[in-house]
């Protein structure tokens, strides 16, 4: 499931829904939107970081990076 969420968020970054260097929805927002646990949302965000789609800033949030 986390891979599907990561693909959905990556698609939003790619199509400009989440512009580069802009804050993206929180893990809590992802949990609510997709009906998943916090652990699943964290796994999706970790995959997005690994793939270069987002960057995380502790205490500030997660930001879109654009197409990796």
Regions found by a protein language model. Name each.
Residues 1-36, 42-55, 60, 66-68:
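Extreme N-terminal segment that seeds HTH/winged-HTH DNA-binding domains in transcriptional regulators
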């Amino acid at each position: 499931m986390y891979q599907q969420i990561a693909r959905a968020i990556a698609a939003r970054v790619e199509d400009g829904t989440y512009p580069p260097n802009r804050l993206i929805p929180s893990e809590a927002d992802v949990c609510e939107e997709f009906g998943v646990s916090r652990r699943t949302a964290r796994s999706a965000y970790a995959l997005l970081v690994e793939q270069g789609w987002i960057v995380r800033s502790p205490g500030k949030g997660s930001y879109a990076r654009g197409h990796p």
